[in-house]
Amino acid sequence: MAAAFVLRNLYRARPALRSPPSELPWAPRRGHRLTPADDELYQRTRISLLQRESPLAMYIDSYSSRGFVVNGNRVFGPCALLPQSVVQWNVGSYQDITEESFSLFWMLEPRIEIVVVGTGDRTERLQPHVLRAMRQRGIAVEVQDTPNACATFNFLCHEGRVTGAALIPPPGGTALTSQAQAAE
């Protein structure tokens, strides 16, 4: 009660306090005017998902001369990675890659945008008619050595692209192992 009495008398004693806050000399001011819609935007909390991770995305964990570890599963020998599956790929070297060996990539729906080919420890040239056949079907082909092909495949999958990979394990000493495999 006493506080209300003091405030009332203080308000009467100082006429400057009766003016609107925007006219007071010490009142904080914005350098720009916001419309009510702008004010509403600043009062809301928004969350934007920058990237949605798919639990079905393929990821190459590691590789060795014996094969690959894909999503924690070991695959021995050459393999073809499709958007949601892994299959054995019946080729021995890059010289065995033909139109027929690539046919599984153009029979899928949704259509694969790009196939990353890992040719072992070196980047090798594929036969021109094989590349031409893939181009005619609207599928891009990226030929790299297997270590770089694994990294490229992981990157493209992480971007959400519909990607396939045809990988031949690198011979000999080239290997990438995960920490879990190194502990075994």
Swiss-Prot record:
**Record flagged with keyword Membrane:** yes
Annotated GO CC locations: mitochondrial inner membrane; nucleus
Which SUPFAM superfamilies would you find in this protein's record?
Answer: MTH938-like
> Where would you find this protein in the cell?
Nucleus; Mitochondrion inner membrane
Q: Name one Pfam family in it.
A: DUF498
What keyword terms does UniProt attach to this protein?
Membrane, Mitochondrion, Mitochondrion inner membrane, Nucleus
Asked if the Swiss-Prot or TrEMBL record annotates the protein with the keyword S-adenosyl-L-methionine, the reply is: no
Predominant subcellular localization, coarse grouping? nucleus
Sorted alphabetically, the Gene Ontology BP terms of this entry are: mitochondrial respiratory chain complex I assembly
Physiological role: Essential factor for the assembly of mitochondrial NADH:ubiquinone oxidoreductase complex (complex I).
UniProt subunit comment: Interacts with NDUFAF4, NDUFS2 and NDUFS3.
Q: Can you tell me which family this protein belongs to?
A: Belongs to the NDUFAF3 family.
Its name, as the record gives it, is NADH dehydrogenase [ubiquinone] 1 alpha subcomplex assembly factor 3
The opening ranks of the lineage are: Eukaryota, Metazoa, Chordata, Craniata, Vertebrata
